[in-house]
Each structure stands twice: as C-alpha cells, then as structure tokens.
Amino acid sequence: MTLLDPLANALSHITNSERVGKREVYIKPASKLIGEVLRVMQKYGYIGEFEFIDDGRAGVYRVQLLGKINKAGAIKPRFPVKARDYERWEKRFLPAFEFGILIVSTSQGVMSHKEAREKGIGGRLIAYVY
C-alpha cells in the first residue's frame, strides 16, 4: 500500500492518539517536513518533546503528547498565501481569531502564520493545529 500524504497521515495519527488519551505516539515514516511541523507545534505548546529514531529505513519520530490538541490536519491543496491574506485563511481553517495556528512553508523555512505575518512574508499553507 502506498502512503500518499505522510504529513496528513502523521497529523491524523497525532489527533487520533490525543482523542484516545495516549501519552506518546510513534510517527513513521519520518521526513524533514514532518520534523519541522513538529518543531512548530512544540514551540506553541501543542506537543512535548519529540525525537528522531533511526530504524534503518525512513526513520520514526517519537512524540510526547500533552492533551492540548483538539484537531490537527494537513491543508490540501497547498494554497499559496500572501503576507496580507493570513486573516482570510485563519477564518477558513481555525475556529476563532487567535485560536490555533496555521503552519506555513516559506522561503525562510517552516513557521506559524503569526511569525510569517510579523516578518511580512508569504508562503504555502501546509497544516493547521488548534
């Protein structure tokens, strides 16, 4: 079976594990994009520590869950967004103003929409978390 979207799979795995009440989850296959998304989620307090475990294949991320995620998902298609248009996308994907984050892939790396707005740069929407 082919895995079409590893990021969407990882985020749904995290969301489902949170709902069941698990304290940690193993995400595979690992990728740089998933690692950067986990870093942003950790920065905003949605997850605890995470680490990369090399299993001789693609690798695995071990993620500590804190029980703070209501929903996390990948945004498909990866919409391009300009620096001044973040509010429109917040209304579409987040339940309330300043509640949750959009994760954006920019020319300066993966970051939240709040950081990208402060820096005045656009990018592509890849995920949301609240």
Curated annotation (Swiss-Prot):
A molecular function (GO) term: rRNA binding
Keyword Metal-binding: no
SUPFAM superfamilies: Ribosomal protein S8
This protein's name: Small ribosomal subunit protein uS8
Protein species of origin: Pyrococcus abyssi (strain GE5 / Orsay)
Subunit comment: Part of the 30S ribosomal subunit.
BP GO terms, sorted: translation
Protein task: One of the primary rRNA binding proteins, it binds directly to 16S rRNA central domain where it helps coordinate assembly of the platform of the 30S subunit.
Lineage top rank: taxon: Archaea
One Pfam family hit: Ribosomal_S8
A GO CC annotation given for this chain: ribonucleoprotein complex
Record keywords: Ribonucleoprotein, Ribosomal protein, RNA-binding, rRNA-binding
